[in-house]
Amino acid sequence: MTEHCASDISDVSCPPRGRVIVGVVLGLAGTGALIGGLWAWIAPPIHAVVGLTRTGERGHDYLGNESEHFFVAPCLMLGLLTVLAVTASVLAWQLRQHRGPGMVIGLAIGLMICAATAAAVGALLVWMRYGALNFDAVPLSYDHKVAHVIQAPPVFFAHGLLQVAATVLWPAGIAALVYAVLAAANGRDDLGGRLCSR
């Protein structure tokens, strides 16, 4: 009976590990465009006013708590990427025969490409919707001293290299953490993977 079961398990065929990992990377890269589109749809724009003072100087200010959207919009992007990272890690863990460091590397690369794609698509879509705002170019006159303007939401907290890198690396770190927790919770040395015929 044991010999019969062992032969059945070894006869299970599965796709090559490299092909599956490349599929995960490409799938996550494509998902980045969807994440960027969703972010551009839900990210709140920033409403501001531009006006002339009595001395003729130009100034601007944000309405109410609109300046908080400089923080809220990038947090939305990180939140969407975090949800995707957790979901992708759990789904990748379900591919039992491909569990291991190769899958973690594939997840990390795919999620970094996904984050970069989401940021690029999101920035492009909000730029197409709201345009680039230059406070000094808003037309004002002494008859119309105040103008209401809308500024596109930012994708990143700042445009420094560190902030951009943190946003791109964030989902890869979350995915690695979730995958590590799943691996640590598994009591088997082979991570519970099934044997496949290659």
Curated annotation (Swiss-Prot):
It is a multi-pass membrane protein. It holds the Pfam family DUF2567. The keyword Transmembrane helix applies. Signal peptide: none annotated. One of its GO terms (cellular component) is plasma membrane. It comes from the Bacteria. Keywords: Cell membrane, Membrane, Transmembrane, Transmembrane helix. It is found in: Cell membrane. The chain crosses the membrane at residues 20-40, 70-90, 107-127, 164-184. Its main location: membrane. The keyword Isomerase does not apply. To M.tuberculosis Rv1591. This is Uncharacterized protein ML1222. It comes from Mycobacterium leprae (strain TN). The lineage of its organism: Bacteria, Bacillati, Actinomycetota, Actinomycetes, Mycobacteriales.
